[in-house]
């Protein structure tokens, strides 16, 4: 009496299809994260460049202000520099979190690929066994 492997074949095909869909979703998320990370890094670099120019602005404005007005201007520039420096640090932390998420998703995609490979090998075995039963 021969065994019917139809259920195993069907089940493995469903599992492979599900894993393939999940992997495609994850790869899409990785792509989006990488694109957005690039945009964030570009903006961060531009703002960092602008921050380096603030001391030049202060130096150029020396003749326009004197006394308390000068001190107020310098304080405002320093406060702005501090706020921007904090923003740059926070942005770098966010970039690091994006990198961690990309690594996590990459590992998940790799695990799904391994699972799909194993399921495909099992599927091929069951298809072979089923074909032997039909002979």
Report each predicted region and the residues it spans.
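Short, charge-rich amphipathic alpha-helices with coiled-coil/heptad character
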Residues: 1-33, 92, 126
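Generic structural concept
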Residues: 9, 13-16, 37, 44, ...
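Secondary-structure edge/capping motif, primarily at the C-terminal ends of alpha-helices
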Residues: 26, 30, 58-61, 65, ...
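Alpha-helical segments in soluble extracytoplasmic regions
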Residues: 29-60
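Long amphipathic alpha-helical coiled-coil segments
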Residues: 29-41, 89-116
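Short coil/loop "hinge" linkers that interrupt or connect long alpha-helical coiled-coils or helical hairpins
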Residues: 49-80
């Amino acid at each position: 009496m021969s065994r019917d492997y139809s259920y195993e074949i069907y089940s493995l095909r469903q599992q492979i299809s599900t894993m393939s869909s999940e992997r495609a979703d994850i790869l899409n998320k990785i792509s989006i994260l990488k694109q957005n990370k690039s945009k964030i890094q570009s903006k961060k670099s531009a703002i960092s460049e602008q921050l380096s120019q603030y001391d030049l602005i202060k130096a150029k404005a020396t003749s326009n202000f004197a006394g308390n007005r000068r001190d107020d201007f310098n304080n405002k520039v320093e406060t702005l520099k501090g706020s921007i420096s904090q923003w740059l640090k926070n942005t770098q932390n966010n970039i690091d979190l994006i990198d961690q998420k990309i690594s996590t998703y990459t590992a998940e995609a790799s695990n799904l690929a391994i699972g799909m490979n194993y399921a495909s090998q099992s599927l091929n075995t069951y298809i072979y066994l089923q074909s032997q039963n039909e002979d």
